[in-house]
Amino acid sequence: MTRHFGALIPSTNTTCEIEYSHLLPPEYQAHYGRMMSSSPTKSPFSSPLDADLDYQAKLLGTAKVEMVMLVQTSASLHSAGYDAEVTKRMEAASGVAALTSATAITRAIKALKAKKVALVSPY
C-alpha cells in the first residue's frame, strides 16, 4: 500500500523533489506544494512564503495525503513559537496532521536517544 504525504517547499527549491524521489522507500510518495519565494539569496524565510502556506497546505489536503510537512529548516528561525503556530495552521488548512523540519528532527533525535548528532549541510 502506498502512503502519501505532502511537502511544502519554497518555489526556488529545485532539489527537494529529486532528493526525495531517491531517498524514499517505494511505498512512500511525496506530493509538493510550492510557496512563493522572491529570491533564493534573500532572507531564508519571508512573508511571501508564509502568505502561501495556508493555501498550499489546503491544496495538499485535497490530494488525500496522510500528513503535511513544511520542508524548510530556516522557518524555525522565522520567529519564536513559529513552529507550533505554523503546524496548527497547516493542520487546519489541510485537515491532516502536520510537521515542520525542526520538529521532525527533534522527534527523531529523541526517538533514537541520540547523545551526539552530526550535521552535514550544503549551507
Predicted feature locations:
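Glycine/small-residue-rich loop that forms an oxyanion/phosphate-binding "nest" at active or ligand-binding sites
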Residues: 57-103
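Proline-centered loop/turn at the N-terminus of a beta-strand
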Residues: 29, 96-98, 116
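Short active-site-adjacent helix-start/loop capping segments
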Residues: 39-42, 76-80, 108
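N-terminal glycine-rich anion-binding loop in soluble enzyme alpha/beta folds
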Residues: 1-55
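Hydrophobic alpha-helical segments within soluble ligand-binding/sensing domains
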Residues: 52-54, 98-113
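Gly/Ser/Thr-rich loops at beta-strand to alpha-helix junctions
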Residues: 9-14, 72-80, 122-123
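An alpha-beta-alpha
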Residues: 115-123
